[in-house]
A protein has these predicted regions:
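4′-phosphopantetheine-dependent carrier domains
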Residues: 1-219
């Protein structure tokens, strides 16, 4: 089937454009000041239709960045090569955040940024998944999350119908898989991350969208 409708949903909506622009700005320092002796290396988890990927790749074009586009399903991988292969050094792979990366063929401690857009909350145990994701990040690197932090009732008849929506098994969540910004901070601290910040600010008008960009550092 066609991915065009889903791609439009995750890129054209005003809220998506705003939050993806924040995520794109967050990766700028890695592009402007790449690691010595090699191009930047980025791993995206749960890439799906590539809504956030598109914004990041626009920022990365011409930088020589090695970009790993991964998803728990292989259904999106061929389309990713069509859309993004000419702009970055693209690698694609099936990846499940509930399993250790190295056993799935991902090199440990080697990515300058690991990013996930509304994907990491799908993990069964967030503290465990956060710790495993941390193991993929090089010292000094970052985790960049885009996450919905507010649950709305209409989710129950949309995303709530997706298989796996309720399969979480940790103490951080009771009824829905989404976490507040403060709960994300707790999960990431347990996972070994430091210097955790989020945007937009809690008291801003933009925060009413219920979406956050969360940055966390590995030292």
């Amino acid at each position: 089937g066609s991915f065009v409708l889903a791609e439009s949903l995750y890129t054209a909506a005003s809220g998506a454009r705003y939050i993806n622009a924040l995520a794109s700005a967050a990766i700028a320092p890695v592009v402007e000041h790449p690691p010595e002796g090699r191009p930047p290396r980025i791993l995206e988890i749960g890439s799906g239709t590539g809504g956030t990927t598109a914004a990041l790749v626009d920022r990365l074009a011409g930088s020589g960045t090695e970009y790993w586009f991964t998803d728990v399903s292989d259904a999106f991988l061929a389309r990713a090569h069509e859309r993004f292969g000419a702009h970055v050094a693209l690698q694609t792979a099936v990846f499940d955040a509930d399993r250790p990366g190295p056993e799935q063929g991902l090199p440990a401690s080697s990515f300058d940024i690991v990013t996930a857009a509304n994907a990491l909350h799908a993990s069964r145990n967030l503290s465990t998944a956060s710790s495993r994701v941390r193991q993929q990040i090089a010292p000094g690197g970052f985790l960049l999350l885009v996450e919905t932090t507010t649950h709305h009732a209409w989710f129950d008849v949309s995303t709530g119908l997706i298989e796996g929506w309720q399969h979480f098994e940790d103490d951080l969540r009771a009824e829905v898989p989404l976490l507040s910004t403060s709960a994300w901070r707790e999960a990431l601290l347990v996972g070994g991350f430091e210097e955790i910040v989020s945007f937009p600010p809690e008291d801003s008008v933009a925060a009413e969208m219920g979406q956050r960009v969360i940055l966390a550092r590995v030292t």
